[in-house]
C-alpha cells in the first residue's frame, strides 16, 4: 500500500523536476474540478497528482469496493486542486485532495455526531504563562492525514470522479475522508484514548 503511494509520488516528482519547477507557481491556475483539470494544458501533471492522492488513500485503506445495499445513495466527492510553491515562489508540486461533499449527507443515515472538543483560548494562554514561568518548552504537533486514521462508524458510500464501479457496486468509506461531517468527531474519538491510555496524558 504505502509503496504504491511512494511510487506514485516519485513519478509525480520526476515529471515536476523536469518540466515545472522553474515556473512561478502563480502562473499555473488551480482547476475548479476534475473535468477542468483533465482539459488543462497541465493535464498530465494533474493526473499524476490525482494518482498520488488515490495511492495515498489506498495506503490508508480509506475505502473499499462493496455491493451497494438496497436504498444506498452514494455521496459525490470532488478533487480540490492546488499548486504548492517553494520559498522562491516556484512550483514545488501540484496537489490533488479528494473531498466528500458533506453537505449531501443525511442526519441519522450518513452521520450522527459531529462535535469535536478543541482547546479554549483561555486554556492555551494558561499553558503559555505556565511555560514562561517555569522556563519550559511548548510544542505543537500536526498529525499528517489525521482524519484518515479514524474509522467511520456508519456505512457511507461515495462517488469518486474518474472512477466508475461495476454495476451494483460502490465505494464504501472505511476511514473518515475529508469533508465528511463526522470526520472531526471520529478523529477526536480515536486520538483521546491513545493520549490517555498509551501516552500518559491526563
What kind of region is each of these model predictions?
Residues 1-193, 197-202:
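Chromodomain-type histone methyl-lysine reader module
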